[in-house]
Amino acid sequence: MSASNGEIVQRIESLLASAKKLQGDDQYGRFGLLKEIDLLYQDVEPPINTFFKQWTSLTFFSCIDIAIKLGLFEHMKGRESITAKELGALVNVDDDVIARVMRVLVASRFVASKGEDAYAHTHKSLVYVKGEHTAVDSFNLISLLAVSYITIPEYLKTRSADELVDIRKTPYACAYGMEGKTFYEVLSTNPDHLDTFNRSMSEPGPEWGMFPFESLRENVLAEPERPFVVDIGGGKGQALLRIQEETGKVFGTSSQLILQERPDVLEQINQDDIAGITKMPYDFHTKQPVKDAHVYFFSQIIHNYPDHVCQDILKQAAGAMGPSSRLLIVEAVLPAQTDVGGDMGAYLIDFVGLAMGGKERTEKEFATLLGTVGLELVKVWHGKARHHAIVEARLKRA
């Protein structure tokens, strides 16, 4: 039921009050304000407009995809304005097509209009220009995944529940005609697709500071001979560098920080860039060679796989843990009840998992998964925003 006129006025006044409370660059406050605005918009818009908005979103996505892949945003960079004809000549595409794409982007206030068929960047479109701290690589990855999104309805109608959790029969693999290969094997068949994935993974990760590593000082000082943190599948060591910084280089002890990754990943890392960190080739489906570390650390790994694969990964770590070892899993933790009007990030990533064979989990689902490999959930350390969290687990107590 739509909100009444009186309710609309009251909520706008509430929005105004919230806006007046904002101080400086208060990102969390702005996020809360956006949530209120979005909820009001949904209550005011007529039902048929929901379809129109979805149609608009699909077309908008397609136009951004075209602009990125043709290099339009790159050619616009550094110019006060550029015409459709000039862009068309630069990318060898009919200028009428360029104009039609740009109309959608201008109407969405994403690109600025500088006269008839002339355009310029806005602060929003610049986010899609190649470079550090931009969204272009993540967008390109979602564009690859979108191919499988379109095929999921037919996949679900024709496949069994067991096939959905078979990592060699994912919607992504089937959409690209490569059933029998895992998501990562499909990616590896196309160097451009693999490069897109690797680039998107190097973009800013989850919120930091959720788990108090400083609280482990006493334990580490008491037993410095034990490895401090084993980062399993830790990429280029970004997390260990942050932990190193937070703990004053492991509280001044000789306790190790160990980065475990595939050999090909480790070969790309200059040891000088991760001073004080030990590189160790490792496949997390095999027996964990480092025993009784203070912390075993997984960041953005577990959500890439269905439960039966996660059990195989986690039992390797559990088999190496000592009585006081901790297992930390950096993941989104979904609320037990869906958060209406809140941040969509975790739900969007969960749908990515549906396509590629993984999933996001609730606290209850994490507890169940951990229990199957002899671990127990101790605590979920939540971040300030969104659904970012660290799941802490230990060996089950007798």
Swiss-Prot record:
This protein's UniProt keywords: Methyltransferase, S-adenosyl-L-methionine, Transferase
Recorded superkingdom: Eukaryota
Record GO biological process: methylation; secondary metabolite biosynthetic process
Effect of inactivating the gene: Leads to a reduced production of hypothemycin but an increased production of 4-O-desmethylhypothemycin.
Pathway listed: Secondary metabolite biosynthesis
S-adenosyl-L-methionine among keywords: yes
Active site: H303
Use case: Hypothemycin is an antifungal agent that exhibits excellent activity against Peronophythora litchii, which could be helpful for the storage of harvest litchi fruit. Hypothemycin is a strong inhibitor of a subset of MAP kinases such as human ERK2. It can therefore be used as an anti-cancer drug thanks to its inhibitory activity of Ras-mediated cellular signals. It can also inhibit Trypanosoma brucei kinase TbCLK1 which is a good candidate as a therapeutic target for African trypanosomiasis. Finally, hypothemycin also has inhibitor activity of T cell activation.
Broad class of enzyme this protein falls into: transferase
Pfam family, one: Dimerisation
Key word Methyltransferase present: yes
Residues that, per the record, bind S-adenosyl-L-methionine: G233, G234, E261, D283, F284
Molecular functions per Gene Ontology: O-methyltransferase activity; protein dimerization activity
PROSITE patterns on file: SAM_OMT_II
Entry EC number(s): 2.1.1.-
Protein's job: O-methyltransferase; part of the gene cluster that mediates the biosynthesis of hypothemycin, a resorcylic acid lactone (RAL) that irreversibly inhibits a subset of protein kinases with a conserved cysteine in the ATP binding site such as human ERK2. The first step is performed by both PKSs hmp3 and hmp8 and leads to the production of 7',8'-dehydrozearalenol (DHZ). The highly reducing PKS hpm8 synthesizes the reduced hexaketide (7S,11S,2E,8E)-7,11-dihydroxy-dodeca-2,8-dienoate, which is transferred downstream to the non-reducing PKS hpm3.
Record family assignment: Belongs to the class I-like SAM-binding methyltransferase superfamily. Cation-independent O-methyltransferase family.
Protein name, entry field: O-methyltransferase hmp5
Organism: Hypomyces subiculosus
Gene that encodes it: hpm5
